[in-house]
Each structure stands twice: as C-alpha cells, then as structure tokens.
Amino acid sequence: MTEVTTPMPAAGPTRPTPDPAALFAPFAPGTVHHPLATPPGPVRPPADEVRVRYPTRLNAMALQPGAIAGDNNLIYDAGEVVFSVARHHHVHVRRRDPGAGLVLDPGVRRPELAEHAALIMCAALGVEPDLAIGVESDPLPVHAGFGSSSSLIAAVAAAVNHLYGCPVDRADLLPYLTGNHGEEHGSRPGLLTPVQCIGGSAASGLYPGGVQVVAGRGTVVLSVPVPEHLSLVIGVPRSLEERPTDELMAAEVAHFDRFRATGERWSPTIAFRMLHEAMPAALRGDLGPLGSLVFDYRFRMGSIENCSFSHPGLTELAGEVESLWHEKAATVLALSSVGPAFFALTDDPGRCAERFAELDMDVIHARPHNGTYEETGSAR
C-alpha cells in the first residue's frame, strides 16, 4: 500500500460560497438538456412488452473530485471506480396503443424518475411515449451512496431501448443519461434537481464486469470481473435520516472548495497510480493495487472529510471503520459516493459485518454482479 499522509495544502483564497438556489435550477421530467450525440440505429417496431433487471452500484472513488464542484450544465468529467451490485431494479415495459400516452403502474415508488427516464429515452428514439411502465426495486436506502436514483433511470431507459431493439448503442446511451440526469427536488414536488452524474450507475448495467473504471464523458476504460471468492458487505448508519435532494445539494455546494482542493492536489497522483498500477493489475485479476488506491483516496486524501456533510459524525465513523483495512480484512474498503454507507469487498464477510454492526450500522450482504442488465421476459 502506498501511504499518503502529506497534509492537504491550503486551497488558496476561499471562493464565495455560491447560492444553491442560483445553481442547479429545477426542471420538469422529460427535459432533454443534451441530445443524443449520435443518431440511433434502425428503430424496429416495439415488442409487446419486455422485462429486465438492472444492477445497482457502489461508487468507490472519483478520479478528479474537483470536476464535480460546480453547476456544469450536467457535464461532469470526474471519472469514478464503481462496483456492480446484484441488488436490482426490475422493470416491466408494455407497449400501448398509438396516442394512449405514458402511464406508470401505481406501485412505482419514484414516479418522477421513471417518467423522466421513459420520456428522454423516447425522445432519443424519436418515438411517442405510448408505454406502460412498472418498476420494483430490491430494498436499498435512498441518498445513502448506492446510486439508487441514477440506476433506476438507467434501468427504465435501457428497458425502453430494449423494447425497440436497442437502437442506441451503450457507448452513446451512457453519456446521454449522465447529461440529462436529475433527482426528485424535495421541496418542489413534480420537478427534478440537476445532480452531478458521472456514469457509474448506467455503466454497471450496460457493460459486463463487477468493477469498472469510468473516465471522462461517461467512457468506460476498464471493465473486469470481481473474483468469485470476494463478496460485498455494506454498512449503513442506523441513525441515517433521509434528506431531500435540494437540502443535500445545498450542503454539498458549501463543500465545493474542499472538492476542488482535493482534485488540484491529488488528481495527478490518482491518474498515475490508476493507469500504471491499479488498471494493469486488475486486468490480471489482482484488485490489490486498486484497493490500495481507493483506501488512500478515501482515508488519506481528504475525500471523507469532503463528504462529511452527508451525515453527522461521518469522519469519526470512518476512523473506526478504518481498522478493517489495517487488519487486512478487506481487499477494498470505501465510503460509497458521498455516503454515508461504507462497504468492504472481502473474503472475510463475517469479520466485516461484525465490525459494521459494532459501529451501530445496519449490515447488507451482496454479491458483485459480473454481467450486464438482463432480459427476464418479453413478448412480441
């Protein structure tokens, strides 16, 4: 492991904290901010229905965290390392008669996201949204670091694309989804808030491999399987209180200078170690160097402090979680996204689960998902 203990330098003059209300302006579901860059292939007549299941993901680290620190009109080239998780969104899309419009099953728990995904996908295909959509999701906490919002949007969009024969290639679909991402506003029902989206949630279902490196513009540059002997153990603080997106975004905006400072200080080191150590080893089936880089990023480069807005006491909790790394109980140990969930990729799930439970965390066991999204039923 390469130890990184140099204190972070001052970031220079402190920039005025932006007014969150002046950034990330809300928008209506179905708004297309960035059209599909490449025209779709032939759009065949839709099947009568299709069912797919789409994995979720854990976000181990960003490659350039400073790139998320601003309202960049939904284009974020921060890059990330993600682990695909066998906790799924189950999507059922049915064709309706021409002119019948879009309807969502009453059981859809996050209707604005499902509606947005269906509408922007139909816009990309150049078809009318005459569809009925149902979604059931495996249980996961919302706004805890699982990418539940972005993976749900990706799941519905991929299912609609699948219904029409997949005319939009995955390499084009991924940046289209990141460039049009939004999440429920919170204080303004029916609207979405732009949220930084780097592409890992969509990539986890569009590309095979349990671990993926996503670079700029939603470009997957590495996708490899997770060895079968490793599993995921996730710890979520029991004291977690769900907060609305607009409140979380306001808290994150106040920390933007910290993200920029981390990026300016550490992104060259991250890039070098990723390119010359972590990726070559991962291609040979060794995730050790990647795990060392992830640990240093989270626990030594200031990432967890940057994300401390997501949960009271997060930094102190990280100090307690860190023991799993020093005990060599985890191949990868990280906060997921901005948290507050932590996870371990491990060959000793019992030890990791015990530690999370000792720290008053709910424990979730999951398997890495080494495939793509899967069709589970269709009819023509």
Language-model-detected regions and their locations in the chain:
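Short Gly/Pro-enriched turn/cap motifs at secondary-structure boundaries
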Residues: 80-84, 193-195, 333
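ATP-dependent small-molecule kinase catalytic core of the GHMP/sugar-kinase superfamily
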Residues: 3-48, 61, 67-78, 169, ...
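Anion-binding (especially nucleotide phosphate/pyrophosphate-binding) glycine-rich loop
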Residues: 48-49, 86-191
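N-terminal pre-core extensions flanking Radical SAM catalytic domains
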Residues: 335-346
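Short beta-strand
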Residues: 332-336, 365
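Intrinsically disordered, low-complexity, positively charged segments
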Residues: 49-85, 90, 97
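Active-site nucleophile and cofactor-binding loops and adjacent substrate-binding regions
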Residues: 146-148, 195, 204, 335
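Residue-level signal for inorganic ion chemistry
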Residues: 60, 91, 290, 337
